[in-house]
Amino acid sequence: MKTKEVVDDITMNRAITRITYEIIERNKDLNQVVLAGIKTRGVHLAHRIQKRLAQLENIDIPVAEVDTKPFRDDIKVEEDTTVIPVDITDRQVILIDDVLYTGRTIRAAIDNLVSHGRPSRVGLAVLVDRGHRELPIRADYVGKNIPTSQTEEIIVEMTETDGQDRVLIMGE
């Protein structure tokens, strides 16, 4: 298996900053926004975006932690470890994940969100969009488009869990 680094720490930070600026531009009332990170790396990304929003706009946006496992169609887990610190009804929720691939994780995350309230709108921000969708799901905010083959794998490493920031592509 060959492994190649396709995004380094500087490029990753720039992508997160770009996503943050796009969130500011597209959301007129940031007080209505809730960032919802999909466990695990999506939560880290959400906190980084939250921190940048605080620096740029002097606003404290709430961050939810969304567990997709109880809502997936391929595995069954009963315990839902989702943490949503505010009522999301009539709020603009931006789901955040590290990689968008088939769309199935996002579908499960949306199912989880609507079990907790009725957002006025749900957006999607991803660090990497690798293509190969199985469901009609599209990201509103994309850090990097990295086309892959079905046999390749994208691995996102983040300082919080892996000790460094980078994106790797693994293939034959």
Curated annotation (Swiss-Prot):
Entry-linked NCBIfam families: PRK05205.1-4, PRK05205.1-5
Any matching Pfam family: Pribosyltran
Matching HAMAP family: PyrR
Listed GO MF terms: RNA binding; uracil phosphoribosyltransferase activity
Organism ancestry: Bacteria, Bacillati, Bacillota, Bacilli, Lactobacillales
Keywords linked to the UniProt accession: Glycosyltransferase, RNA-binding, Transcription, Transcription regulation, Transcription termination, Transferase
GO biological process: DNA-templated transcription termination
Provenance organism: Streptococcus sanguinis (strain SK36)
Quaternary structure, from the entry: Homodimer and homohexamer; in equilibrium.
Short motif PRPP-binding, span: 93-105
The keyword Cell wall biogenesis/degradation is assigned to this record: no
Entry EC number(s): 2.4.2.9
Reactions this protein catalyses: UMP + diphosphate = 5-phospho-alpha-D-ribose 1-diphosphate + uracil
Xref: InterPro entries: PRibTrfase_dom (IPR000836), PRTase-like (IPR029057), PyrR (IPR023050), PyrR_bifunctional (IPR050137)
Protein's recorded name: Bifunctional protein PyrR
Coiled-coil spans in chain: none
Gene (name only): pyrR
